[in-house]
Amino acid sequence: MLVSFVVLTVIYALWPLVSHLSRLWYIKDLLIIVLTLVLASLLLHLCRTTKVLQTRMQSGKAQKIWSWILLIVGVPYIISILLAPIMQITHMAINKIISMFVIALMAGVIEELLFRGLLFNSLLSFFYHNKNRLLIAGLISSILFGCMHLINLTHQPLQSTVGQVIFAFTTGIILIYLRLLSNNIVWCMVLHFFIDFKPVILTSNTGSHNISLVKVFLAVLPLMILAIICLWLFNRHYVQTNK
């Protein structure tokens, strides 16, 4: 499955080439939709299941407390993610909004099936005999998810890209935890879509070029730490439950 992950990730990374096949925006969007459907079908077949566990596991007391802390700390981020696009799209042409929707949908579906789906499942199988496999697989998949954004160095500055890697790693841990909590990948796709559904996704520089890396790191550090704690607590509770 790891070989399939690498091959499909490379194919997905080359999706911008599709935009050069036509100058008509609706043809470009249609081609992206077709690519999304094809890749999603292949990934769903390779993943075999969107579940992690046979049945959804109930959270332990400590995990519930830390999950609420993560949610409370994350509320400002959630509000900014939801409100920023609404404020901006009111001044955008309808074709730009449609293109933004299509690209965000592709990213939400394909990147989740790649990293929280195929890669995460593959790592769980690889570390099957390790009691901390949920934690290890979650961290590795999040690191690789962050590193995947290094491909943006081909069209944007180093500072923007590194900031994007830091943010993507943090987001990856949260999305892994969400998949474990829900025992499904659909909610990960929904959250990922809203994170990417913003005008900047249509530009060549999708990173944080006007914000210092120190500020980016400090901004996401609380979420990063809390998400890792929650992931560790979930893994610990899983081990205790399945002794």
What residue ranges belong to the model's regions?
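Alpha-helical transmembrane segments in multi-pass membrane proteins
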Residues: 1-47, 62-76, 94-99, 103, ...
